[in-house]
Amino acid sequence: KPSPDRFYGLM
């Protein structure tokens, strides 16, 4: 599953 950390990396 995708990690929230990767999502924040886009920010």
Curated annotation (Swiss-Prot):
Disulfide bonds: none annotated. Pfam families: Tachykinin. Keywords: Amidation, Neuropeptide, Secreted. GO terms for cellular component: extracellular region. GO terms for biological process: neuropeptide signaling pathway; tachykinin receptor signaling pathway. It comes from the Eukaryota. The modification Methionine amide is found at M11. InterPro entries: Tachy_Neuro_lke_CS, Tachykinin_dom. The keyword Amino-acid biosynthesis does not apply. It is found in: Secreted. Tachykinins are active peptides which excite neurons, evoke behavioral responses, are potent vasodilators and secretagogues, and contract (directly or indirectly) many smooth muscles. Belongs to the tachykinin family. This is Ranatachykinin-A. It comes from Aquarana catesbeiana.
